[in-house]
Amino acid sequence: MIDRSEAVAPAASQDAVAPGSVPASSRLDRVIWALTGLTRRHWLLGLLLAAGLVLRLLAQVGYEPALLYIDSMKYLFGTHLGTQFNQSDLGSYDPIGYSLLVLHPVLIFENLSFVAVLQHLGGLAMTVALYALMVRRGLTRWLAALAVAPVLLDSYQLNAEQTIMPDVLFEVLLVAGIVLLLWPPRPALALVILGGLAFGASAPVRQVGEALIVPGLIYVVAAARGWRTRLLHGAVMTFCFALPIVGYMTYSAVTLHYGFELSNMGDAYLYGRTAHAADCATLKIPAIERPLCPDPAVAATLGVDGTVNSIDSPRSTYHPVDVQAGQLINTMPLQVQLAYSVLRQQPMRVVGDIARDSVKIFALTRNGEEGDTPISRWPFQTSYPYYPYYRSATAHYGRNSASRVFAATGGGGKARVFRPAAILLRDYQLHGGYTPGPVYLAGLLAGIAGIFTWRRRRDSGLALASVLITGSAFAVLLGADLYEFTWRYQLPALVTLPIAGAFGATAVARYIRARRSGVPAAVPAGHAHADGVEELAVAVSEQAS
């Protein structure tokens, strides 16, 4: 006969645990409960993330291995001297930090589709980071979720993530700098260093990132306490911001032989903006410069981009000859002289031209105006898009065909489209799948209002956050509009203006509440936790151990 107590003893010994330890089943239960609680608390973000993920999967399977834009070639081949595509000179037009930071490392895996996947993950990561920042700083969960919805659902953002272009990397660096600097109410020196490096690294990706030093420096100085800390943080921010820029310029001079610069297109776009704005009939300039000043009808048709890049622009068709030397005259110095003449004699025309471009982002619909870079370049197409009329772009056939580009850069197969997914994405984009301009305007106005809630002797965390985010939006959007307006350059609005609006609206609401009650109503910034995130982290770490 078997003793029942002896029969159950082995089972009991198997379930025994060391004193002070937690059973594995209990740890797993804690993880499950933490995940369940997290989902319940952040259900709106979860729904938006699910929708954003579906849209990104459609884009990934709809256009393989990735989309190519007119300027994609210079990033793919800008540092490959002597390629069969003969585009090595294009790397000097714009900084190619995107090639160095993303394309070259990822193409080790010999498939451009991995670049698109990485950029889609970047879009999702920006959403989660911004949402976590807002919840941490005490904003309501529903407001934080609505503020990040444009990043997840905007079809132009989806198109950018699927395209071999630097826009998404620029957004990621911009968001990284904002999140690092705002994570605590007053950033420690380590976060100032990291935030400055993130902002500075954005400039070799898109040169307009140079403007981020202004809001970044203002914020770290204003957020610090004591003049010594302000001086230290300001100096460190400036140094760390400059480090990636100087490093890239050195690389450009020593390795690429383009010169100690980020780009060589500054003078060209200065000419384009001023020539487009000029009243040539009343402008007092030398006769040799006169042909470079376009007629009003020509300027309106070409726009700023066409004035710089079109083969029909005055800078392309005008070829003055030095009779004595018997050679053509380089017109670039003449273009610069014309630009400065316009700035001196007609500054308000230039200001007005920039102002008209800067408000286009607030339009209800996505309609291009005469002279604007065609918005038709950025909607999803039902077949693979080609740009055969541009020297540096891809064509359907020939040596610059998209399929040959993919083969030359490491693989991914031929350019192909899954039409059902492409049709769905195009219909979504053309029927309201984008962020309307009034949303941006509301975010901007709320962000500005939040700045004016700053109070010296009370909690000013949200007001200072509004300074950084709204200032960053001003820097990158207006900085781009100084040279030209294109809808592609408005993408950073998605990761700044709605967020600025959420911070600003919360700051205003708390300010009004405090004025009515006579007591500060602010939640101590940085003490609000992410509603279950910490509990989940603890549970996961215990499960792993």
What positions do the PLM features span?
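Membrane-interface transmembrane helices that cradle and orient dolichyl/undecaprenyl
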Residues: 177-192, 220-224
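Juxtamembrane membrane-water interface segments immediately following transmembrane helices
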Residues: 67-69, 74, 234-334, 341, ...
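Extracytoplasmic catalytic/substrate-binding loops of multi-pass membrane glycan-assembly enzymes
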Residues: 62-76, 88-101, 109-110, 261-262
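Transmembrane alpha-helices of multi-pass, membrane-embedded glycan-processing enzymes
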Residues: 98, 102-109, 115-129, 170-173, ...
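Transmembrane-helix signature of polytopic, membrane-embedded enzymes
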Residues: 130-153, 171-172, 186-193, 467
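Multi-pass, polyprenyl lipid-linked donor-dependent membrane glycosyltransferases
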Residues: 70, 93, 115-122, 149-181, ...
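Transmembrane signal-anchor helices characteristic of membrane glycosylation enzymes that use polyprenol
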Residues: 40-67, 153, 241-252
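Membrane-interface anchor segments at the N-terminal boundary of transmembrane helices
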Residues: 40-43, 113-114, 353-469
